[in-house]
From Swiss-Prot:
Gene field: pafA
GO biological process terms on file: modification-dependent protein catabolic process; proteasomal protein catabolic process; protein pupylation
Provenance organism: Jonesia denitrificans (strain ATCC 14870 / DSM 20603 / BCRC 15368 / CIP 55.134 / JCM 11481 / NBRC 15587 / NCTC 10816 / Prevot 55134)
Active site per UniProt: D58 (proton acceptor)
Entry-linked HAMAP family: Pup_ligase
Protein name according to UniProt: Pup--protein ligase
Domain of life according to the entry: Bacteria
Other comments on record: The reaction mechanism probably proceeds via the activation of Pup by phosphorylation of its C-terminal glutamate, which is then subject to nucleophilic attack by the substrate lysine, resulting in an isopeptide bond and the release of phosphate as a good leaving group.
Keywords, in A-Z order: ATP-binding, Ligase, Magnesium, Metal-binding, Nucleotide-binding, Ubl conjugation pathway
Annotated pathway: Protein degradation; proteasomal Pup-dependent pathway; Protein modification; protein pupylation
Binding of Mg(2+), residues: E9, Y56, E64
Annotated InterPro entries: Pup_ligase, Pup_ligase/deamidase
Amino acid sequence: MTRRIFGLETEYGITYAHPTDDVTLSADEVARQLFKKVVAWGRSSNVFLRNGSRLYLDVGSHPEYATAECDSVEQLIAHDRGGELILVDLIDDAQRRLAQEGYTGTIHLLKNNTDSAGNSYGCHENYLVRRQGDFTRLADILIPFLITRQVVVGAGKIMSTPQGPRYCFSQRADHMWEAVSSATTRSRPIINTRDEPHADAEFYRRLHVIVGDSNIAEPTTFLKVGATDMVLRLIEAGVPMRDLALDNAMRAIREISHDITGRATVTLSSGKTVTAWQLQEMYVEKVRTYVESLGPLSPTDEAVFELWERALRAVETQDHSLIDRDIDWAIKKRLLDRTQDRLGCALDDPRLARLDLAYHDISPATGLGHRLVSRSMMNRVVSDAEVERASQVAPETTRAHLRGRFVTAAQEQKKDYTVDWVHLKLNDQAQRTVLCKDPFAHVDDRVDQLIDSMRTQAT
């Protein structure tokens, strides 16, 4: 597909730090406080917003934000970051109310993937693919890529092991149990095969990737989604690809993550052994050859290739300075290394654990991301203005535009309505419903008429 629909679903960790409070608040209680403002206007903790996104409380009191449908990687990043702005606003509102009730602690919303109890929550990537074609072939080619891409797009994690603490590439790697499955929590596959296209099922299916880490640095998300998109283009074009299947995928994903030198070797089904960066090089070379054969590269493709190849060079040479402003695991490692040197402490020191968490804290007041950007220690892909707009306005080039307009009009006219990814429904006497099955369609006369009817009734 030369044009693709993308989406990110991010589950957030939530905690309440209370150094002086006598009464603590559980994650459930904090989550309820966080969503009070949402429930007040939406009458539910599961709502679609004016910017086309979905915001809800997931299992385990994890706030989850699902971006609207986006048709470029840059647009997706803006809307992912826009979700952070929305959640920070909810944090501030809940914080004020708790302060009025005498609570002096701080709510922390963490864009990470594991908690102190060993539970994992995810960042799920969604890629629209055409129904035609062999999905088994797609998965077979994609799985080795997804397992090894952690060396260039992992979020980094301090992990306790029987051999002592170690710094790993990925937060999600140790929580994966299958390559492909229709489950999401019980067995946690790399690719979820549950067939929910949120589009015309005759033509499309939704590739649901749940192996990835949640990223703080925008360039890491840019590479994660951009490189995956280009590998999908290669597969969809039917370009022959040598068999890179791993002999033991679940062992490989863990062994790769645990060796921050990038030199851990994994065994292919053919019996050959390779490192993760060598396997990634095979993909990037094949993809570059294919994409360049189609004509001049787009600025986005150029930027993806540049960062992808630079990140692999950093892993191969161990020169992390090549990427320690762009790639999460390298940025965080630089911070941890400097702090460890300054304090003269071990990697399992609680102060380093707090630093690790602060890296993933999305609040400008308590998190590190905003400070790193302001000090030129973390690069950007999109502007503050683009993020601010994305927090309020749906993408104008996809179906999300229709949903955003409908939700905005219904709220302004105080109409009762129901929405999901495909349906727009007015809960009036006529129960009028519009089915929007084409995720690329941003213009629809039926939606225009539905919106006009609301405004006509109001006059």
